[in-house]
Amino acid sequence: MPEGSKEAGSPARKRPAPQEEARRHSAAHRVEYALARTLESAVSALPERAADGVGRRIGRTIHRLGIRRKVVEENLRLAFPEQSAEWIHRTSIAAYEHLGREAAAILRLSKLDRQAIIDRTVPVGWDEMEEALSHGKGVMLVTGHYGNWEIAAATVASRGIPIAAIVRRQGNRLVDERLNGLRARLGVEVITQREAPSRVPRLLRKNAVIGIVGDQDARRAGVFVPFFGRPASTHRGPAVFALKLGAPVFACVARRLPGAAVRYEVSGHGVPVVRTGDLEADTTALTAALAARLEAEIRKAPEQYFWFHRRWKTSPPAEQPSSETGTVEAVSAPADPDPDYA
C-alpha cells in the first residue's frame, strides 16, 4: 500500500502544524533521530555487500563491549543445554554479527523497491498461501524475531498481496514514523496494537494478510507453552484472532541464506486450527503449535534468532524461581494491558 494511503472509510488525519510537531518530540529524541538518519544515509550510500560487512563488524564490536552478552549466552544455554561452552561462545558472536548485518539491511530499506525485494527473496509455500487466500477469509501470518522479519512482510507485499503488520510503537516517535514510512513504501500497511481489535477483522474480510511477530515474553498476560523444552509466556493474540475470526494461520520466517549475497528464504506453511469449543484450550494448543514451528526453524540457524530478549523472563504461576540455577526469574508485575506483538 503506498505511503500515506488510508483504509477506505477511515477519517482523514490532519498533520500537526510545525510548532505542534516540535513540541511532540523531546530534544533527546530529535538528536537520536538525526543520528539515526545520518547512519541510514551512510549505510545506504555503500554498496550492499560493503554495508553488510560494516554491519557484521559493528555487531562483533558490540559483542566485545559485552552489551547484553550475558543475556544472549544464558538464553543459548537454556535453549541448547547439550552444547559446549565453545559452541555457546561461537554462536553468541555469530548472533551479534547477524544482528549487525540485518540492522544494516533495514537501514537500506529506503534503497529498495518491489523488484529489489523479489530479487532478494526465495518464497517457499507460496502456492499453499494462495490457495488459503482463495477462500476469501484472509490469512494470519505469524512469525518471530528470526532472520529478518521486516523482509518477511515486504516479500508478501512485493508479490502483490495486501498485507498489514501489527507493530509496537517505538518510544521515539520520529524513528517510529520513519520506520513506518519505509514499511509503507514497500507496500506494508501498519496497525498499532491498540488499533488491532477493530482493524484486523475489517482487513481479513477484505482478504488481506495480517502479519504478527509474537514471540516475546508476554508477562502475566501470556499463555505458557513449551519453547526449547521450557515454558515460555507467549502472546495469545495471534491464536485468538485466528480462532474467533476463522482465518487460516501460517507460520512464516525469512531466513538469511548463506553466501556473500544478501538473500532470504521466506517460507510460510499452514498450521492446523482445531476448534473444540473451549477457547482457552484451543488458544493454548494453537499458540504451542506456532511456538514449535518457530523453534524448528531456529534450530536450522540458531545464530539468526534474537537471543537478546529475555524469552523466559516470566515464570509459570505454579513455578517458583530457582535460587541455585538462576535460570528462572519471578515477575510480580501485573498483566500487561498492551501486549507486545512486535
Regions found by a protein language model. Name each.
Residues P2-A27, T38, L46, I58, ...:
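Non-catalytic C-terminal accessory region of glycerolipid acyltransferases
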Residues A116-T121, R168, R185-I191, F228-G229, ...:
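Short, flexible loop segments at the rims of nucleotide/cofactor-binding pockets, characterized by
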Residues D119-P123, Y146, N172, V190-Q193, ...:
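A conditional alpha-helix N-cap/helix-loop micro-motif detector
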Residues M129-E130, A153, L179-N180, V200-P201, ...:
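Short amphipathic alpha-helical segments and helix-helix/interface helices
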Residues S134-R194, D217-V223, R256:
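Catalytic core of membrane glycerolipid acyltransferases/transacylases, capturing the structured
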